[in-house]
Regions:
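Cationic, low-complexity basic patches in intrinsically disordered or flexible, solvent-exposed regions
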Residues: 2-3, 27
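N-terminal leader/targeting segments
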Residues: 3-5, 13
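Short loop/turn segments that flank or connect secondary-structure elements
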Residues: 25, 29-61, 70-181
Length: 181
């Protein structure tokens, strides 16, 4: 039996988890007549049309994008590991230095409107990925629930389930997980 060769492909972008949910869910008039939009912005706007604040609020704080991933050379399958970027606070799922993350972790991928469609390794539950694929947000998403803890409460966060790369064995295959990705 031949063993698959896996390579670390990405550590992923680390997003700050600023609680803007309440403000994002407040009704805002969308025209001079003072009428209120009938649908939330993520259901009416394309990713490219969103403001920076709206874009950042899409992050559900799961931390999965900040995990080391391995890609099989033979079939390109991406495996998630339980090893997090050294900047991810494993208990809060927040980046320890979001504004300067690419200085500390040069291969940290910055998710953007330009590259969101090309990053097929993003978690299947990621709001950016879901919206780029024309899908809606899951019921547990903080923008839907109005509660930043809903990702964790739904079991969709890596909070408390991962270790820092600083504490991991160099053989990342030891840490491959089968969580929902």
């Amino acid at each position: 039996m031949q063993r698959a060769v896996l390579h670390c492909i990405v550590k992923g972008p680390a997003h700050t988890r600023i609680d803007k949910t309440a403000r994002m869910r407040e009704p805002m008039t969308d025209n001079d007549s003072g009428t209120f939009p009938s649908q939330p912005y993520w259901e009416t706007k394309k990713l490219a049309e969103m403001s920076r604040e709206e874009w950042e609020a899409l992050c559900d704080g799961c931390g999965k994008c900040c995990l080391h991933k391995l890609q099989d050379e033979d079939d390109d399958f991406v495996y998630y590991t339980s090893v997090a970027c050294r900047l991810l606070d494993c208990e809060t799922c927040q980046c320890k230095d979001y504004p300067n993350r690419t200085v500390h972790v040069p291969d940290c991928v910055q998710l953007s409107r330009e590259n969101v469609d090309t990053l097929n390794w993003m978690p299947s539950t990621c709001a950016y990925r879901l919206l780029s694929e024309g899908k809606g947000l899951p019921d547990w998403h903080p923008l839907v629930t109005g509660n930043r803890e809903s990702t964790f409460m739904a079991g969709m966060s890596v909070r408390g389930m991962v270790i820092s790369e600083d504490d991991a064995h160099p053989d990342l295959t030891r840490y491959i997980v089968k969580w929902p990705a």
